[in-house]
Amino acid sequence: QWTVDNGPCSGTTNDAVSIFIYDNTAAAADAGADQELCTPTTTAQLAGNAPVGVAVGTWTVTQGTATFADANDPNTTVSGVSLGETILTWTIDNGPCGTTSDAMRILLFDAGNPDADAGPDQEVCTPVTSATLAGSAVTFPAQGTWSVVQGTGLFADPNDPNTTVTGAGVGENIYAWTVGNGPCANGLTADQMSLFVFDANNPVASAGTDQELCVPATSTTLAGSAVIFPATGTWTLISGTGTIADANDPTTSVTGLTIGLNTFVWTVSNGPCANGITTDTVSIYLFDEGNAIADAGPDQELCTPNTTTILAGSALTFPSQGTWSVVQGTGVFADEND
């Protein structure tokens, strides 16, 4: 304090001066660690470092919105934080020793952000090996990421829910869409979808050659054309009887055939390819071991002008077939197989 005694004039006057001693060794500003919140919470307690001595610290909003309870308190409470990323800066003014600043961010996640949904399965046919995915949208700062679970694929942008994937291999390619939603209850959710790539060169359906069996045999092995996954083949019975061991195996066994004609269809489904659905049939003829041997019936005598008669050949069990033929003389059969 400076005091001036001016006698009877103006008397005694004084004035004070303050000298602030700043600490040159004081630590630079440290705003503390980043924080994550989830709605409905929009408040947080900050953790800046305390100024030393007469130095002064001040919080400011660099990005987003927020209200400080005390902008000069390193451990103040901040409220009204906006959804997304809010950046707060802690600045320490250390007088002639200098000013330092540090920033921290508060990420406010949305509790209403939907769980991960990878979208519907998709089918393409070579030469196409790409597709546009349809993952669920995310609300920042939540983040979604595509990854390959099975097969192959290259994502144009693995964080874009609607990214394009290329280089998918023939078969089933499984992709996962994983959404990270911070500290919310649904903090980490995932879902998968399949991209089926069908081969345009997959052969059309062939049920194999017809077969003939004789009882007591009532089973056989079918010979359908092979399929290239994800194409599928399916056997069905359309006449007769038969139990198919594995309806999707082109070379499955079939049992319980009945005497006569048993017909099976081999259907190949090749997705969106030009030969998407093709079919072929195979006939399995089961002959009766007990079918009678040929008997042309008794000899007959006719007198002109009658030159017609009814023959009496032995009966037969289908698929056995009888055939009349002329050995000597002449004759015309109304039905040579009757």
Question: Could you say what each language-model-derived stretch is?
Answer:
Residues 25-33, 112-120, 201-209, 290-298:
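Proline-enriched interdomain boundary motifs that mark the N-terminal boundary
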Residues 41-52, 75, 128-139, 162, ...:
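A short beta-strand segment in extracellular, disulfide-stabilized domains
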Residues 13-22, 101-109, 188-198, 278-287:
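C-terminal edge beta-strand
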Residues 58-73, 79, 143, 147-160, ...:
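Low-complexity "stalk/linker" and mucin-like segments enriched in Ser/Thr/Pro/Ala/Gly
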Residues 73-87, 160-174, 249-263, 338:
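Solvent-exposed segments in extracellular or luminal domains encompassing
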Residues 4-10, 93-97, 180-186, 269-275:
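Short, solvent-exposed loop/turn segments at the edges of extracellular beta-sandwich modules
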